Swiss-Prot record:
The lineage of its organism: Bacteria, Pseudomonadati, Pseudomonadota, Gammaproteobacteria, Enterobacterales. It is an enzyme of class 2 (transferase). InterPro entries: GlnE (IPR023057), GlnE_rpt_dom (IPR005190), NT_sf (IPR043519), PII_UdlTrfase/GS_AdlTrfase (IPR013546). PANTHER family: BIFUNCTIONAL GLUTAMINE SYNTHETASE ADENYLYLTRANSFERASE_ADENYLYL-REMOVING ENZYME, GLUTAMINE SYNTHETASE ADENYLYLTRANSFERASE. Belongs to the GlnE family. Its cofactor is Mg(2+). Keywords: ATP-binding, Magnesium, Multifunctional enzyme, Nucleotide-binding, Nucleotidyltransferase, Transferase. This is Bifunctional glutamine synthetase adenylyltransferase/adenylyl-removing enzyme. The gene is glnE. It catalyses: [glutamine synthetase]-O(4)-(5'-adenylyl)-L-tyrosine + phosphate = [glutamine synthetase]-L-tyrosine + ADP; [glutamine synthetase]-L-tyrosine + ATP = [glutamine synthetase]-O(4)-(5'-adenylyl)-L-tyrosine + diphosphate. GO terms for molecular function: [glutamate-ammonia-ligase] adenylyltransferase activity; [glutamine synthetase]-adenylyl-L-tyrosine phosphorylase activity; ATP binding; magnesium ion binding.
Length: 947
């Protein structure tokens, strides 16, 4: 323990003179000497109650003694017979425990987080103890409040602010909201009361018991102004009244207050759960809510003005970089993202900071500095208040209290403490300004740049009007831009936009127009952005996102200019605008092997039993990942092969999650097939064909899937609703198809085509592995064996995967007559061309026409089926590029031809990706890709036409 500083050692002599009889300087420990010198509150208390000092000297306070508060208070209230004795015992108990906490805090016997916890538990214990005693007393007098069904109704108390967050300071008032569940009347008393009357009287008596000063002091100053309608509203509200208020009139600052709200006492009963469920949507919005930024700025501005008005200097709570700014920083993330990130819904600041770090919402160093600063400031605040049990956050001006604080904070002197404090508050202020900033107007340069565009936006210029800021555009482009602006304004007149929405739009549009019209393709870009804006003008939070984050606006303009597909996706699903905030992730897709893990974490935010939210979350995750892949594609950071790799890995992660969800639902209903009891896995596999099987998915590709199982004929499920095992797998596959195809507000997940299964659409949706093998060996057509070349298991346990791989290898390595195979493959290609060929004779269909992608695929498939019995290694891969490599490595095709076909294939696929980004069909002018087409046609003739 740090020895007392010189000023405090001198002050000790004053303390000695006030010590109670029986206590001498030599009889006191160093710890007692330190605490009594530091805290006048502790000194006054032990003078009034000398036994407390003896108790502290013999048994120091413990970190976990808050667990005993309720039991100790129950003993103290055992003999209470009226309100007066209740008030006396509550005050006595509070003072005794506060002295113990001051002792532990001053001597650093427990850490600062635990001190906050002890202070909060003490308050909750006193509130609940007083409520329960008074509730019983009121019931004896007026009867028990009941609903119409006769069910007793409790008084629920919401602890707000630091009390709710478990972070109460030493000398704090307490913010409470009172509620009761249902209307009704009291029963069993001397007179009947309406429930509203009963709970109002109970609330009034509770406030008096805690708040009214007596000769013993008070327990806590009680502040009820956070309740609906504040001081002018009812003291206690029913659940229905609370719900109506927060749905219809709840204000931003009430959302912030409600973040920390916690029900006092036993809060896991049905009434408590109902109240929490009712309040949660008000506090944590399902969508990303950027209106928080401006609202917190406004609140901070009000506080700053109050600090100036009241001359509050050296205020460690409200000043720049103080406790309130740390709270604001944390609340920004809670209120913007808390609806989608349950880890941000903690009432306490420090766990929420941990969640912010885990979600990478702030740099690690910033989070570390905020944590250290918060604990430093909270310790300083508590020590300051414990000197006189006084509610203050203003640093002292007198030398004695400055010396006390310097010693308590383990600084050598006051200047050193001020220096440390200044550093911490500067760190907080920096993060606060970067995140929230001051509510200041644009800089003069920004104002000068945006002002003429404000005129363009607000003055509704005609097509033939001239304005200097559009002079750089060609006449036709200028007319198009003005027409688009005019049409957009007309469209807005049809939309129910509130005052806040119009205000934000008027702030946003000058900046947007300035950026868009600086581009050569201004008209095209604006034509893609205005439909998006028209779709979000009634959802102000998205406008605020673009207004608050210029970087997001810049990326929006760039991506919409590059791709109408992206513009359409953003317009259809505005939730994706959130992805524009972080260019570090926007242009860096998830690592290919990390999609499953990221999706798993994403789905943890959604209750497993909530199917609707699960479906929505799957679709939102997919759309966000597609946007990131497309952005990287546009930026040139992903080559064509990598684009398809990412799209394929994403699809596999989705399949994994959908099967998991379907399996969970089926097992809950029927149990699992009994043959799985003695083995690992699920006896189920999903096989991907076509582009999925070949690692070649495009942006809008559907999924070609078949489903396999290995369930014996006579197996039943082991659940209460027993069904045949094979019927279980059929229903599982049907459930999977349903989960993929169900249309939610975020669309469908994927189009799934299961027609490549044995016997096609006429066959069973799910097939046993044995039946699949038999079909492939005895009934399948050559084109089905071609399809098998590009097939692989995308979900399945190892046993079934191995079974499928064996069947595939066996079929592909079967010896075939070369001439017959050549004829069958060629005839199938001709049928496809006749059925799917290009209807635009003056255009080249990149996929279907001669010399296109399908020809390359057929060449590869033919050669594998033709030569795999001689070269089994040809069966290793299912994608065309690596098959071409294998053909060269095994001497089937010369290396030059294989390389040339690979280049042609990737070039044509790259073009298809880019056409998809432009929302264009997959055909180009006949003159395009003539070199690649000639090469493919020559290879086709060599392998599939030559005699």
């Amino acid at each position: 323990m740090t020895p007392l500083s010189s000023p405090l050692s001198q002050y000790w002599q004053t303390v000695v003179e006030r010590l109670p009889e029986g206590f001498t300087e030599t009889s006191l420990s160093v710890q007692a000497k330190s605490v009594l010198t530091f805290s006048d509150f502790a000194l006054d208390s032990v003078i009034a109650h000398p036994e407390w000092l003896a108790e502290l000297e013999s048994a120091s306070p413990q970190a976990d003694e808050w667990r005993h508060y309720a039991g100790w208070l129950q003993e103290a209230l055992a003999g209470v017979c009226d309100d007066a004795s209740l008030m006396r015992e509550l005050r006595f108990f509070r003072r005794r425990i506060m002295v113990r906490i001051a002792w532990a805090q001053t001597l650093s016997l427990v850490d600062d987080e635990t001190i906050l916890q002890q202070l909060s538990h003490l308050a909750e214990t006193l509130i609940v103890g007083a409520r329960d005693w008074l509730y019983a007393a009121c019931c004896r007098e007026w009867g028990t409040p009941c609903n119409p069904q006769g069910v007793p109704q409790p008084l629920l108390i919401l602890g707000m602010g630091k009390l709710g967050g478990g972070e109460l300071n030493f000398s704090s008032d307490i913010d409470l909201i009172f509620a009761w569940p249902e209307h009704g009347e009291t029963r069993g008393g001397r007179r009947e009361l309406d429930n509203a009357q009963f709970f109002t009287r109970l609330g009034q008596r509770l406030i008096k018991a805690l708040d009214q000063p007596t000769m013993d002091g008070f327990v806590y100053r009680v502040d009820m102004r956070l309740r609906p309608f504040g001081d002018s509203g009812p003291l206690v509200l029913s659940f229905a009244a609370l719900e109506d208020y927060y749905q219809e009139q709840g204000r931003d600052w009430e959302r912030y207050a409600m973040v920390k709200a916690r029900l006092m006492g036993d809060n896991d009963d049905a009434w408590s759960r109902e109240l929490r469920a009712m309040l949660r949507p008000f506090v944590f919005r399902r969508y990303i809510d950027f209106s928080v930024i401006q609202s917190l700025r406004n609140m901070k501005g009000m506080i700053a003005r109050e600090v100036r008005r009241r001359g509050l200097k050296d205020n460690i709570k409200l000043g720049a970089g103080g406790i309130r700014e740390i709270e604001f920083i944390v609340q920004v993330f809670q209120l913007i993202r808390g609806g989608r990130e349950p880890s941000l819904q903690s009432r306490s600041l420090l766990p929420t900071l941990d969640a912010i770090a885990a979600l990478h919402l702030l740099p690690e160093n910033d989070v570390a500095q905020l944590r250290v600063a918060y604990l430093f400031l909270r310790r300083l605040e508590n020590l300051l208040q414990s000197i006189n049990d006084e509610q203050t956050q203003t640093l002292p001006a007198d030398d004695l209290n400055r010396a006390r604080l310097a010693w308590g904070m383990k600084a050598e002197n006051w200047p050193q403490l001020v220096g440390e404090l200044t550093d911490h508050m500067a760190n907080v202020r920096r993060v606060f300004n970067e995140l929230i900033g001051d509510d200041e107007a644009d800089t003069p340069q920004e104002e000068e740049r945006s002002e003429p565009w404000r005129e363009v936006w607000q003055d509704a210029l005609q097509e033939d009007d001239s304005t200097p800021v559009l002079a750089h555009l060609a006449d036709e482009d200028r007319r198009q831009v003005l027409t688009l602006i005019a049409d957009f304004r007309k469209e807005l007149d049809k939309r129910p936009i509130g005052p806040r929405g119009r205000q934000v739009l008027d702030q946003l549009m000058p900046h947007l127009l300035a950026d868009v019209c600086s581009r050569e393709d201004a008209a095209v870009t604006l034509s893609r952005i205005t439909p998006l804006l028209a779709g979000i003008v009634t959802r102000t939070t998205y406008l605020e996102l673009l207004s608050e984050f210029p970087g997001a606006l810049k990326h929006l303009i760039m991506l919409c200019a590059a791709s109408p597909m992206i513009a359409s996706q953003l317009a259809r699903y505005p939730l994706l605008l959130d992805e524009l905030l972080d260019p570090g992730t926007l242009y860096q897709p998830t690592a290919t092997d990390a999609y499953r893990d990221e999706l798993r974490q994403y789905l943890l935010r959604v209750p497993e039993e909530d199917e609707e939210q699960q479906l929505e979350a799957l679709r939102q995750f997919k759309q966000a990942q597609l946007l990131r892949i497309a952005a990287a594609d546009i930026a040139g950071t992903l080559p064509v092969m990598k684009v398809s790799d990412h799209l394929t890995w994403l699809a596999e992660a989705m399949i994994d999650a959908v099967v998991q969800q379907a399996w969970t639902q089926m097992v809950a209903r029927y149990g699992q097939p009994a043959h799985l009891d003695e083995r690992q896995g699920r006896g189920f596999a999903v096989v991907g064909y076509g582009k999925l099987g070949g690692w070649e998915l495009g942006y809008s590709s559907d999924l070609d899937l078949i489903f396999l199982h290995d369930c014996p004929m006579d197996v039943m499920t082991n659940g209460e609703r027993e069904i045949d095992g094979r019927q279980f797998y059929l229903r599982l596959a049907q459930r999977i198809m349903h989960l993929f195809s169900t249309r939610t507000s975020s669309g469908i997940l994927y189009e799934v085509d299961a027609r490549l299964r044995p016997s096609g659409a006429a066959g069973m949706l799910v097939t046993s592995a044995d039946a699949f093998a038999d079909y492939q060996q005895h009934e399948a057509w050559t084109w089905e064996h071609q399809a098998l070349v590009r097939a692989r298991v995308v979900y399945g346990d190892p046993q079934l995967t191995s079974q499928f791989d064996t069947v595939r290898r066996t079929i592909m390595t079967t010896a075939r007559d070369g001439k017959t195979l050549q004829t069958e493959v060629r005839e199938m290609r001709e049928k496809m061309r006749a059925h799917l060929g290009n209807k635009h004779r003056d255009r080249f269909d990149i996929k279907a026409d001669e010399g296109g992608i399908t020809d390359i695929e057929f060449i590869a498939q033919y050669l594998v089926l033709r030569y795999a019995h001689e070269k089994p290694k040809l069966t290793r891969w299912s994608d065309n590029v690596r098959i071409l490599e294998l053909l060269a490595q095994n001497g089937i095709m010369d290396e030059h031809e294989a390389q040339a076909l690979t280049v042609a294939y990737t070039t044509l696929r790259d073009e298809l990706h880019h056409l998809a980004l432009q929302e264009l069909p997959g055909h180009v002018a006949q003159t395009c890709f003539s070199k690649e087409r000639a090469l493919v046609q020559a290879s086709w003739r060599k392998w599939l036409v030559a005699v």
